[in-house]
Amino acid sequence: MLFRSKLTASLGWAPDRLPIQEQATIVVGNALRLEWASICPPTEDTIVAGNPPFLGPHSRSKEQLQDLQLVWGTKDLGRLDYVTAWHRKSEQYFESTKRGRFALVSTNSVSQGDQVARLFPSLFAAGWRLRFAHQTFAWTSEAVGAAAVHCVITGFDKAEPTPPLLYAYTQVRGEPI
């Protein structure tokens, strides 16, 4: 019961059934071309979390451009980063539910300039609200060839309104305060 209380305090919600039962399903494919609901039907308790690829308009392949066009339903993408396709896919995935949650690591470019005007209005119009956000921070990894980018993390939900949380950083390479 204590664990459930801590989960509720930190996330604002805890699943009814703890411990969580393992159900491994591995699907190999292009996440932007797969129908997510056919793999895992959305429920009001489903959470989508991810760290999709960061690819700006000058660094994606023709296939990735086609993925982005398919998900957004337009060839007029402006400067939308490839990662925005996962925001749109998450929005589409939860269309049949009244609730849902998703959080994604993205390049900080999605929170500035013309990408803001293209990405966020459709989310807000569909009833999504910003639940939490991490301000820009430097991506760190011990992996060989790790991305050298500045990131944000944004979390969205359709739940009852509560004040959104902002995780601020005094330095991009620091810890949130």
Language-model features and meaning:
Residues 1-177:
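Signature of N6-adenine DNA methyltransferases within the class I
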